[in-house]
């Protein structure tokens, strides 16, 4: 199996761990990063971000986070539309990463992006 990474590349970080990994990986790939999370603490000033709101729930379930991610679909599509390749970084043991990764991957594939996750 071969995979070609086409420029421009977007590194997407999902949740807490994914956001940290994406910020570092974007430096390595000399690309932009996008942080998608339901926790505002995961955002930094260097990256574009999409806040997936799960308010007013304090401890949201995986299902709620996934549903809220689907509600943010148009904003996510706008962010990925300008890139050819997308690298998705997420901690699948965490709620945010496990909830968001399938949704984000599907959006990127529907937009005909080369996806590594």
Predicted regions and their residues:
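Tubulin/FtsZ superfamily GTPase core signature
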Residues: 1-117
């Amino acid at each position: 199996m071969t995979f070609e990474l086409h420029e421009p590349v977007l590194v997407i970080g999902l949740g807490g761990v994914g956001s940290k990994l994406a910020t570092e990986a974007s430096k390595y790939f000399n690309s932009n990063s996008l942080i998608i999370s339901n926790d505002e603490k995961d955002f930094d000033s260097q990256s574009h971000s999409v806040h997936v709101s799960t308010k007013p729930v304090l401890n949201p379930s995986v299902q709620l986070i996934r549903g809220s991610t689907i509600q943010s679909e148009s904003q996510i599509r706008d962010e990925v539309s300008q890139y050819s390749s997308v690298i998705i970084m997420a901690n699948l043991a965490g709620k945010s990463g496990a909830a968001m990764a399938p949704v984000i991957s599907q959006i990127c594939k529907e937009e005909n992006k080369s996806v590594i996750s």
